[in-house]
């Protein structure tokens, strides 16, 4: 596909999406829910075929030498597909926020003023690896009354094409336009440049991938961007804490799955509990093959752990997103140092405190500058499905418009509604 053909194709997709967005914006809730349920059914009915398409992507990825954590992100296992189907069903049971009017109040002039929640219109989604994002984005787009143009990574092209076909079939079965969800079929990177530079069609871009991709899009886009940056998440073990609980949570936050952006990459431990806690969590990590990169005090406390892989941490380790069985560990004086460390080195994604002190917990919630802050829970809960959003289109580390897991409301905006009875301004 030459440059001119790519440009023409993207503009055609944009025009079709814009037309479809007008129909989606006024679609009744029951019709949108019918499409979501049809999609859930198709995902279950086509699990075997989808895995065959996915197998081709996995084979190419391994042949190309893609790192195993990245290959893991490509997998469409039965569990992943079932989670996607459940997400669609959960969205279908949720209330429809489109058209809701809030804050209606009488003004001294006589008019009544409120705000109505409406779809954004058309969003472009650019993402790498995870093909399940195709379903998450499509289902949220349907529920929120938007249209979307999806551009997945070349490494998942067969999986994404198969999933996009199912989405369009479900839309058409429900009587909605198939063009409301479109996939950019070419793997040529030039397509991204066109997608992010079509303000006449696209209202917002949502990139989800590596730091380089997101920085490039943020720099070059001619439409607003909702960024999903890296997940350098932290778990802070406070003094006082329930050490047994802290071991359980710190283990889950790191090892339940290594590749997601909400896995803890940094472990901070208050000096008062370090001697008791670190050998216990160190033994757990060692048994699971997790490399521990620590400060000198950490390494001294872990020196007696059988089978432990210990490495001196560098300054870079404190801000690193590993997406692998590696964790940085630092002993800190207490809460103040932990908060300062997280705000300096973290990515403002998700951070947790494990504590018995209510005041410490409240300070952590107020002062840690992250999209999600947690008390006595694993950072792995930072997820739209776990938050009851049905699905998420990403986890925004921005502070404006949407922050944290972006669900239905993150894909809407508010417009002012003014009601009068022939009122005129004096």
Swiss-Prot record:
It is found in: Cytoplasm. Pfam families: Aldedh (PF00171). CDD domains: ALDH_F18-19_ProA-GPR (cd07079). The keyword Thylakoid does not apply. InterPro entries: Ald_DH/histidinol_DH, Ald_DH_C, Ald_DH_N, Aldehyde_DH_dom, G-glutamylP_reductase_CS, Glu-5-SA_DH, GPR_dom. It comes from the Bacteria. Its EC number is 1.2.1.41. It catalyses: L-glutamate 5-semialdehyde + phosphate + NADP(+) = L-glutamyl 5-phosphate + NADPH + H(+). The keyword Oxidoreductase applies. GO terms for molecular function: glutamate-5-semialdehyde dehydrogenase activity; NADP binding. GO terms for biological process: L-proline biosynthetic process. Pathway: Amino-acid biosynthesis; L-proline biosynthesis; L-glutamate 5-semialdehyde from L-glutamate: step 2/2. GO terms for cellular component: cytoplasm. Keywords: Amino-acid biosynthesis, Cytoplasm, NADP, Oxidoreductase, Proline biosynthesis. Belongs to the gamma-glutamyl phosphate reductase family. PANTHER family: DELTA-1-PYRROLINE-5-CARBOXYLATE SYNTHASE (PTHR11063:SF8), GLUTAMATE SEMIALDEHYDE DEHYDROGENASE (PTHR11063). HAMAP family: ProA (MF_00412). Catalyzes the NADPH-dependent reduction of L-glutamate 5-phosphate into L-glutamate 5-semialdehyde and phosphate. The product spontaneously undergoes cyclization to form 1-pyrroline-5-carboxylate. This is Gamma-glutamyl phosphate reductase.
């Amino acid at each position: 596909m030459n440059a001119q053909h790519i440009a023409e194709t993207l503009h055609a997709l944009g025009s079709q999406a814009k037309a479809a967005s007008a129909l989606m914006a006024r679609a009744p809730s029951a019709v949108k829910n019918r499409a979501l349920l049809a999609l859930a059914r198709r995902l279950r009915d086509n699990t075997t075929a989808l895995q065959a398409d996915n197998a081709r992507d996995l084979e190419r990825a391994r042949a190309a030498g893609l790192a195993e954590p990245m290959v893991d992100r490509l997998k469409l296992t039965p569990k992943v597909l079932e989670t996607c189907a459940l997400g669609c069903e959960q969205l279908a049971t949720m209330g429809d926020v489109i058209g809701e009017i809030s804050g209606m109040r009488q003004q001294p002039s006589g008019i009544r003023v409120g705000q109505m929640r409406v779809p954004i219109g058309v969003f472009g989604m650019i993402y790498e690896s995870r093909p399940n994002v195709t379903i998450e984005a499509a289902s949220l787009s349907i529920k929120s009354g938007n249209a979307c143009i999806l551009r997945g990574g070349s490494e998942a092209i067969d999986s994404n094409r198969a999933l996009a076909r199912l989405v369009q079939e479900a839309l058409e079965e429900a009587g909605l336009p198939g063009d409301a969800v479109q996939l950019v079929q070419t793997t040529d990177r030039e397509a991204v440049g066109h997608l992010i530079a079509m303000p006449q069609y696209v209202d917002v871009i949502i990139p989800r991938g590596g730091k380089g991709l997101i920085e490039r899009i943020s720099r070059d886009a001619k439409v607003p961007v909702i960024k999903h940056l890296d997940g350098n998440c932290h778990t802070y073990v406070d003094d006082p804490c329930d050490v047994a609980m802290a071991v359980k949570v710190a283990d889950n936050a790191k090892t339940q799955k290594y590749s997601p952006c909400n896995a803890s990459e940094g472990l901070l431990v208050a000096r008062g509990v370090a001697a008791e806690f670190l050998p216990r969590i160190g033994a757990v990590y060692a048994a699971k093959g997790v490399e521990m990169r620590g400060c000198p005090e950490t390494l001294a406390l872990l020196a007696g752990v059988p089978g432990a892989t210990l490495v001196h941490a560098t300054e870079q380790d404190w801000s690193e997103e590993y997406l692998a069985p590696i964790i940085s560990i630092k002993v800190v004086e207490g809460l103040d140092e932990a908060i300062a460390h997280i705000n300096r080195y973290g990515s403002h994604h998700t951070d947790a405190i494990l504590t018995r002190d209510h005041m410490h917990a409240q300070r952590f919630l107020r002062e840690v500058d992250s999209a999600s802050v947690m008390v006595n829970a694993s950072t792995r809960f930072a997820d739209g499905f776990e938050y009851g959003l049905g699905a998420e289109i990403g986890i925004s580390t921005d502070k404006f418009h949407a922050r944290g897991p972006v669900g239905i409301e993150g894909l809407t905006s508010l417009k002012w509604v003014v009601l009068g009875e022939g009122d005129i301004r004096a």
